[in-house]
Amino acid sequence: FMGGLIKAATKALPAAFCAITKKC
C-alpha cells in the first residue's frame, strides 16, 4: 500500500514529496 501511495505522491506532487520525506 505504502509503495503505491509513494508512487502516486511522487507523480502528483514530486516537490511536496521531496520536501516532506527529505528524499530528493
UniProtKB/Swiss-Prot annotation:
Compartment list: Secreted
Database matches in InterPro entries: Antimicrobial_frog_1 (IPR012520)
GO cellular component: extracellular region
Single GO BP term: defense response to bacterium
Tissues where the protein occurs: Expressed by the skin glands.
Domain of life of the native organism: Eukaryota
Predominant cellular place of this UniProt entry's protein: secreted
Disulfide bonds: 18-24
Entry keyword set: Amphibian defense peptide, Antibiotic, Antimicrobial, Disulfide bond, Secreted
Pfam families (alphabetical): Antimicrobial_1
Function comment: Has antibacterial activity against the Gram-positive bacterium S.aureus ATCC 25923 and the Gram-negative bacterium E.coli ATCC 25726.
Protein name in UniProt: Brevinin-1PTb
Annotated source species: Pulchrana picturata (Malaysian fire frog)
